[in-house]
Amino acid sequence: MQHLVIRRPDDWHLHLRDGGMLRGVIADTSRHFARAIIMPNLVPPVVTSADAATYRERILAAIPAGHRFEPLMTLYLTEGTDPDDVEEGFRSGLVKAVKLYPAGATTNSSSGVRDIDKAMPVLERMAEVGVPLCVHGEVTTADVDIFDREAVFIETVLDPLRRRLPDLRITMEHVTTKDGVDYIREHAVNLAGSITTHHLIINRNAILVGGIKPHYYCLPVAKREMHRLALREAAISGDVRFFLGTDSAPHVDPLKECACGCAGIYTSINSLSCLAHVFEEEGALDRLEAFTSLNGPAWYGLPPNEETITLRKQEEPVGYPAKIETEAGPVTVFDPMFPLYWTVIEA
């Protein structure tokens, strides 16, 4: 197959940052994606509907002329989040979800939840109203190995929360383990999972073998090969509970290439080329549209996009920049470690 026409995709987990970084990266998403769930972990974080409204205006102002893109706003859950504000923001159409960051789990998560019981009033209201909860599914206690954080989170936090609030709709974001895939499949009600582009391609060897490679370091960290294969199987399965959330997360190179580098991989610019490669490799190009364009909208109660894009397979590898320049500084682009032949020719 040399051409593939799919509905215009959406990204159900995206970091745009703010200021000069926002202005430097947004075009790589808005060029091909119609909508994206925008992560709220700014400094300071997006904790109220008013915060979300002003951040949304900054995003809209940064979208290049001619690009049609809708940012879908989220709130950063804290132990003091106001249930009334969440409900009002959701009912107004501004707020699409609330994000749970366990404190210390990832970039700018220090304001996150340390005691889930203290967030129960807002979680109970969300269950009543139908507001989705997006979770960064890792525990952060020092006694848990970093490669086990997701599995332990499922057992000690997610499963008890779902039993306590069975009506709460939960997105387990950036699933990285077979444990996560299996848990979603075994619990069909009010639970879904997003999968990143890079976790379909790299395992932990990419970070550690032959020297430490900071541009493959992300959180949740890439796991063993068995987990990568489980993610691939889930992504290509057509199962409506799994959909694309790139977790594209730009950091300037000096903050990655240092003694204590930031977690995050920038994939917005070449995600669709990478995904077409993966799905072709798995003999599943006919299911790429479900993963990128259909399953996510169905989960979030939105219609799929009417517009389409066309992917074409070239005879020669497709070029993409090794870095992009932003007002904040240079950002290294994800290198999948294989040539890419698929490119978007219409959007």
From Swiss-Prot:
UniProt keyword Zinc present: yes
Gene Ontology MF annotations: dihydroorotase activity; zinc ion binding
Keywords annotated in UniProt: Hydrolase, Metal-binding, Pyrimidine biosynthesis, Zinc
Positions of the catalytic residues: D247
InterPro entries, sorted: Amidohydro-rel (IPR006680), DHOdimr (IPR004721), Dihydroorotase_CS (IPR002195), Metal_Hydrolase (IPR032466)
Binding site residues for substrate: H15, L16, R17, N41, H136, L219, H251, A263
SUPFAM superfamilies, per database record: Metallo-dependent hydrolases
Cofactor note: Binds 2 Zn(2+) ions per subunit.
Reactions it catalyzes: (S)-dihydroorotate + H2O = N-carbamoyl-L-aspartate + H(+)
Enzyme Commission identifier(s): 3.5.2.3
Residues where Zn(2+) 1 binds: H13, H15, K99, D247
Function: Catalyzes the reversible cyclization of carbamoyl aspartate to dihydroorotate.
Family: Belongs to the metallo-dependent hydrolases superfamily. DHOase family. Class II DHOase subfamily.
Protein name: Dihydroorotase
Lineage summary: Bacteria, Pseudomonadati, Pseudomonadota, Alphaproteobacteria, Hyphomicrobiales
